[in-house]
């Protein structure tokens, strides 16, 4: 740095190496954060969908049995009241996740909401991707909670 004409080749290469290392670690951290946000948003949107089904069952005094439809890598949650056999369409009784990398790995087969006394068949739905897992837990009284893997207290 004592030369009059600028930086030496070694100084430039060291600066470039530091810049590349910081950029690579920042890119990895950003991708991990983005994947974890997509997982959380999918679980939250599924919770909102189930809240809608619970309120609809109570308001119209009808039952909503939830099932999953898989079409290749695409999956969706469908209410029995929708009468749909596909993930395509714009029915509010069908939930299609925005991001295909979020998987639904487990669903209680008899998960349902009943209009009579606003009750539910207890169960859970598990969402996962490369960053972790979220559980959507339904109680017999229709309470919905989001729990992260390994979390025993403080479910949302």
Curated annotation (Swiss-Prot):
This is Prepilin peptidase-dependent protein A. Residues 1-6 form a propeptide. PROSITE patterns: PROKAR_NTER_METHYL. It comes from Escherichia coli (strain K12). The chain crosses the membrane at residues 7-29. SUPFAM superfamilies: Pili subunits. It is a single-pass membrane protein. Keywords: Membrane, Methylation, Transmembrane, Transmembrane helix. It comes from the Bacteria. One of its GO terms (cellular component) is membrane. The modification N-methyltyrosine is found at residue 7. Not yet known. It holds the Pfam family N_methyl. It is found in: Membrane.
């Amino acid at each position: 740095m004592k030369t009059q004409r600028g930086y030496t080749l070694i100084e430039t290469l060291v600066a470039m190496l530091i810049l590349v290392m910081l950029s690579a670690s920042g890119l990895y951290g950003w991708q991990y954060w983005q994947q974890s946000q997509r997982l959380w948003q999918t679980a939250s949107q599924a919770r909102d969908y189930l809240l809608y089904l619970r309120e609809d069952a109570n308001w119209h005094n009808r039952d909503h049995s939830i099932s999953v439809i898989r079409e290749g890598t695409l999956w969706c949650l469908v209410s029995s009241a929708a009468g749909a056999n596909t993930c395509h369409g714009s029915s509010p009784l069908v939930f299609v996740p925005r991001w295909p990398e979020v998987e639904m790995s487990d669903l209680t087969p008899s998960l349902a909401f009943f209009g009579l006394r606003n009750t539910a068949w207890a169960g859970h739905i598990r969402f996962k991707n490369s960053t972790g897992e979220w559980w959507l837990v339904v109680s017999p009284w229709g309470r919905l909670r989001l729990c992260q893997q390994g979390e025993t207290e403080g479910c949302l």
